[in-house]
């Protein structure tokens, strides 16, 4: 039977698939729109599965907070290119998934992907956009009597901070989260640095100080001073506050009686993902010539 341009247009709008694909499945389905959609979904899912092996190291970080700001989630959703990372449908998927995770109290990305509707939507978007899409990681923070602070920088860095204490405010939560985004602390307090890390850093400092030729007692003081400086550089409470470097984050928090940082999490798009090497233009051309 003849397939009209209007039918093709409707199927394209409903599915996001290409014009020729829509015309083909409409012909096979003899004009049955729902059957054609099922055919596209089946073929789209197959395409999505093939793309799953491709490296997805671009993407976005999104956060979601409950109305009382006592719960929050941060989610990383990856794709292959910066172009798709700015796509409205991709961004909507990320935002909706974060909202769903918050509403359902989900603790990790695996729990989110266990939802058949989420996985179906992800695979449908893979088919539509032509790139592998991954809900890579999710973390959920909660406080009993305080606030969760959230900050997202350029969709590429996202932070949640759990502040416990009645005096904690939304502004303080956001400020501390912003600081974490910028300063990359590794722990909350200097005392949380592992003994192994301390010993490793101390050995490095001893080696460096030994070359100075100074007396042993002076070297010991040098090592102690440098080690304390290092601890304050990697611990949140010891770092100079980004909005007011004349005081530390610890001093900022102390100005809010009874408030303490329980936990923080910082996600950055693609961190820890080994990207596939990109060949330069000349190499790509040579590969094509040799393959022809």
From Swiss-Prot:
Cellular component, GO annotation: cytoplasm
Listed GO MF terms: translation elongation factor activity
The keyword Protein biosynthesis appears for this protein: yes
Subcellular location: Cytoplasm
Region (Involved in Mg(2+) ion dislocation from EF-Tu): 81-84
Keywords annotated in UniProt: Cytoplasm, Elongation factor, Protein biosynthesis
Main subcellular location: cytoplasm
PROSITE patterns found in the cross-reference section: EF_TS_2 (PS01127)
Coiled-coil annotated residue ranges, if any: none
Transmembrane regions: none
InterPro entries named in the record: EF-Ts_dimer_sf, Transl_elong_EFTs/EF1B, Transl_elong_EFTs/EF1B_dimer, Transl_elong_Ts_CS, UBA-like_sf
Job of this protein: Associates with the EF-Tu.GDP complex and induces the exchange of GDP to GTP. It remains bound to the aminoacyl-tRNA.EF-Tu.GTP complex up to the GTP hydrolysis stage on the ribosome.
The family this protein is said to belong to: Belongs to the EF-Ts family.
Matching HAMAP family: EF_Ts
Protein's name in the database: Elongation factor Ts
Provenance organism: Acidithiobacillus ferrooxidans (strain ATCC 23270 / DSM 14882 / CIP 104768 / NCIMB 8455) (Ferrobacillus ferrooxidans (strain ATCC 23270))
Annotated gene: tsf
């Amino acid at each position: 039977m003849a397939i009209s341009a209007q039918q093709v247009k409707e199927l394209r709008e409903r599915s996001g698939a290409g014009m020729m694909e829509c015309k083909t499945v409409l012909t096979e389905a003899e004009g049955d729109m729902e059957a054609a959609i099922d055919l596209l979904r089946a073929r789209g899912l197959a395409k999505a599965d093939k793309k799953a092996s491709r490296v997805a190291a671009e993407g976005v970080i999104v956060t979601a907070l409950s109305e009382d700001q006592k719960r929050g989630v941060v989610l990383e959703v990856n794709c292959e290119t910066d172009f798709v990372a700015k796509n409205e449908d991709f961004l909507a998927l990320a935002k909706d998934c974060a909202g769903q995770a918050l509403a359902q109290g989900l603790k990790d990305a695996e729990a989110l992907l266990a939802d058949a509707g989420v996985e179906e939507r992800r695979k449908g978007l893979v088919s539509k956009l032509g790139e592998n899409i991954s809900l890579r990681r999710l973390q959920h923070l909660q406080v009993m009597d305080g606030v969760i602070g959230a900050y997202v920088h350029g969709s590429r860095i996202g932070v949640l901070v759990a502040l416990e204490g009645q005096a904690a405010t939304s502004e303080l939560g956001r400020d501390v989260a912003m600081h974490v985004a910028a300063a990359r602390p590794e722990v909350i307090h200097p005392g949380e640095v592992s003994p192994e890390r301390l010993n490793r850093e101390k050995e490095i400092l001893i080696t460096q100080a030994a070359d100075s030729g100074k007396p042993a007692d002076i070297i010991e003081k040098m090592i102690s001073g440098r080690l304390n400086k290092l601890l304050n550089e990697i611990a949140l409470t010891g770092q100079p506050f980004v909005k007011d470097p004349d005081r530390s984050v610890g001093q900022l928090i102390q100005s809010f009686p009874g408030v303490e940082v329980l936990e923080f999490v910082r996600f950055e798009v693609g961190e820890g993902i080994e990207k596939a090497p990109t060949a330069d233009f000349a190499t790509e051309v040579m590969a094509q010539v040799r393959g022809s």
